[in-house]
């Protein structure tokens, strides 16, 4: 029988006083992922959005979603890591701590690139908030330079709230005796920093996280071949189809989900089910439970990342 850990979480609710309730979180006994958020950089709902897709969330707050982010947990060593630091960092860190013992911050943060939904959460590690001590932040060369030479991020470095850990494209970073991470540079709008996805290794098993890329065809590598080699794949699904937003979509290039499904249509079912679409714009119908788009994706054998879900290697 497999050993399970149970952590009792004390949730405090404030309303003219204090009340509390206990929740039980079941923790696998081998490394796993926690989906900490699924929305595009601006979150869901998005600022100034008056469309039904957003107004529905004000009537029913349970429909809201945090910005795309995944957590990796090793229950054997009681360690955790985050991939990206979003504007929802505070809530996501707390969610991740449910799966480790007596730790309030992750053991490391891997940044993919310098767009607002992917690194700005580290501000909560600074003096105005937690005033953390030497939290490891893994960053590529341009990202390290950007954080070191531009305020307010440079203050996090100079006051040692964070310690920048250098990583290089295609170079493996060993985290412990079970887990390692390899950054993979991908084409994207690199105004300030380069953009990477991450391959996560656990023994002979591998996962891939690419929340942002311009188009699969612009990458000199084959995403189809990568999928065949992986056990879990989290992929950019910002927009479901062309024309989804009322602007020139070439200004914000991403692979449309319709394009990705067509590209992946010849994969065998076992490979298709490895794929979790993530990083949804507020206009993306994959955010709507039971939508035609959701049913279409699932009928083709693909998966949709769900916030707070636990995914085993």
Language model feature labels by segment:
Residues 2-9:
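Sec-dependent signal peptide recognition
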Residues 15-17:
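C-terminal motif of bacterial Sec signal peptides marking the signal peptidase cleavage site
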Residues 23-98, 164-226, 310-313:
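Core dinuclear metal-dependent hydrolase active-site scaffold
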Residues 32, 79, 134-136, 231, ...:
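Residues at the starts of beta-strands that form the adenosine-phosphate
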Residues 66, 73-138:
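Active-site metal-binding motif and surrounding structural segment of the metallo-beta-lactamase
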Residues 82-86, 105-118, 122, 138-140, ...:
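Active-site neighborhood of phospho(di)ester-bond hydrolases with catalytic His/Asp-centered motifs
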Residues 142-151:
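A short, active-site helix/loop in glycosyltransferases that binds the activated sugar's phosphate group
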Residues 204-206, 213-309:
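Cap/insert and terminal regions of metallo-dependent hydrolase folds
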């Amino acid at each position: 029988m497999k050993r399970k850990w149970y952590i009792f979480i004390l949730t405090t609710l404030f309303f003219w006083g204090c009340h509390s309730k206990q929740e039980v979180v079941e923790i696998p006994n081998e490394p796993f992922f926690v989906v900490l958020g699924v929305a595009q950089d601006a979150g869901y709902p998005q600022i100034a959005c008056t469309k039904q897709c957003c107004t529905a969330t004000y009537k029913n707050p349970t429909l809201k979603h945090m910005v795309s982010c995944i957590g990796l947990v090793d229950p054997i060593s009681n360690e955790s890591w985050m991939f990206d630091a979003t504007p929802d960092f505070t809530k996501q860190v707390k969610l991740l701590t449910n799966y480790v013992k007596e730790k309030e911050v992750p053991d490391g943060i891997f940044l993919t690139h310098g767009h607002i939904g992917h690194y700005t959460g580290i501000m909560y590690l600074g003096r105005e908030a937690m005033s953390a001590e030497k939290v490891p932040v893994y960053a590529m060369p341009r990202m390290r330079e950007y954080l070191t030479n531009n305020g307010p991020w440079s203050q996090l470095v100079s006051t040692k709230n964070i310690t920048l850990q250098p990583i290089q494209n295609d170079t493996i970073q060993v985290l412990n005796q079970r887990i390692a991470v390899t950054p993979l540079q991908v084409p994207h709008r690199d105004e300030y920093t380069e953009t990477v996805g991450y391959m996560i290794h656990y023994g002979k098993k591998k996962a891939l996280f690419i929340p942002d890329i311009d188009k699969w065809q612009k990458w000199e590598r084959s995403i189809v071949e990568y999928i065949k080699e992986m056990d879990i794949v989290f992929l950019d699904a910002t927009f479901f189809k062309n024309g989804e937003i009322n602007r020139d979509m070439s200004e914000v290039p991403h692979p449309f989900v319709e394009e990705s499904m067509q590209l992946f249509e010849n994969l065998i079912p076992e490979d298709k089910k490895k794929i979790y679409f993530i990083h949804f714009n507020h206009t993306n119908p994959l955010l709507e439970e039971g939508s035609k788009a959701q049913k279409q994706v699932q009928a083709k054998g693909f998966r949709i990342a769900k916030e707070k879900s636990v995914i085993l290697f």
